[in-house]
């Protein structure tokens, strides 16, 4: 039997998603909890591996098991063995054709940026921060150059294991709410560090360091050294993974973050 889980986690508490020998990753914590509840080792496959500091609101995993449990039993039983920084939100039996990674056709990330002369300790690990004003319109104009199917080598980490740098970026939204700017990135898939590298470039344009059309030149150059430095991970959230309707994957529970009302206005896909 194949079981899918919806998982949320505080990325600041972990060294990324992927299991490591030191055991301080989200995958390590989840698989330990599943093993405790099931009394047998269980291996998970994830929709998208997030880096250290990146949060998960709509992360999806699957695993195979012969155990017969109710859906909510998997939720409550696994959560009983998880730290407070990770939570299984739902569980659902799936057909063998479902695959958390390969069945997904799109991913959506949000970035929350706090723009204020002084950093807030209440937002540590929850939002990025910059002390200088930003030009929202300039960032929107720059983002427009990135929409479509392109070779995103200029925004790819040297450690990226993707077979191709070509991805289809469907949408970038920039929405201001008080001292916060909310960015939404939606694509069929993302390269390693791609969103954070895009953020670094958008912020550089917003600060007036480059004109909006500079980003078109960076994209065309297909050279990582042309782009701005990788932006901090603190405000990055994996919010949604899209699957074909036949799998009826439950929607991510975004109400757990204080800025969910702003995100709702951005019309998160279901």
Swiss-Prot record:
Top-level EC class as recorded in UniProt: isomerase
Gene Ontology terms: biological process: tRNA pseudouridine synthesis
This protein's record includes keyword Transmembrane helix: no
GO MF assignments: RNA binding; tRNA pseudouridine(38-40) synthase activity
E.C. designation(s): 5.4.99.12
Alphabetically ordered keywords of this record: Isomerase, tRNA processing
Catalytic activity: uridine(38/39/40) in tRNA = pseudouridine(38/39/40) in tRNA
Functional summary from the UniProt entry: Formation of pseudouridine at positions 38, 39 and 40 in the anticodon stem and loop of transfer RNAs.
NCBIfam families to which the protein is assigned, alphabetical: hisT_truA
Known partners and oligomeric status: Homodimer.
Protein's UniProt name: tRNA pseudouridine synthase A
Species annotation: Burkholderia ambifaria (strain ATCC BAA-244 / DSM 16087 / CCUG 44356 / LMG 19182 / AMMD) (Burkholderia cepacia (strain AMMD))
Gene: truA
């Amino acid at each position: 039997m194949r079981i899918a889980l919806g998982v949320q986690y505080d990325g600041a508490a972990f060294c990324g998603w992927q299991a490591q020998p030191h055991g301080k990753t989200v995958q390590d914590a989840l698989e330990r909890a599943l093993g405790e509840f099931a009394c047998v080792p269980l291996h998970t496959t994830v929709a998208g591996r997030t880096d250290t500091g990146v949060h998960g609101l709509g992360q999806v995993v699957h695993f195979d098991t012969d155990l017969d449990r109710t859906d909510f039993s998997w939720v409550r039983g696994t959560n009983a063995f998880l730290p407070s920084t990770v939570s299984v939100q739902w569980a659902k039996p799936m057909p063998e054709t479902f695959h958390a990674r390969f069945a997904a056709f799109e991913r959506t990330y949000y970035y929350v940026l706090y723009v204020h002369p002084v950093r807030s300790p209440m937002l540590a690990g929850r939002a990025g921060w910059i002390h200088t004003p930003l030009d929202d319109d300039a960032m929107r104009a720059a983002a427009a150059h990135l929409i479509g199917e392109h070779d995103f080598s200029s925004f790819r980490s040297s450690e990226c294991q993707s077979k191709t740098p070509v991805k289809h970026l469907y949408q970038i939204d920039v929405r201001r709410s008080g001292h916060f700017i909310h960015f939404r990135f939606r694509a069929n898939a993302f390269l390693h560090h791609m969103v954070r590298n895009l953020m670094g470039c958008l912020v550089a344009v917003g600060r007036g360091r480059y004109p909006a059309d500079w980003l078109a030149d960076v994209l065309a150059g297909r050279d990582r050294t042309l782009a701005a430095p990788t932006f901090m991970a603190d405000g990055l959230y994996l919010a949604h993974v899209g699957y074909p309707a036949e799998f009826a994957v439950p929607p991510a529970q975004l109400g757990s973050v204080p800025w969910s009302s702003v995100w709702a206005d951005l019309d998160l896909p279901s």
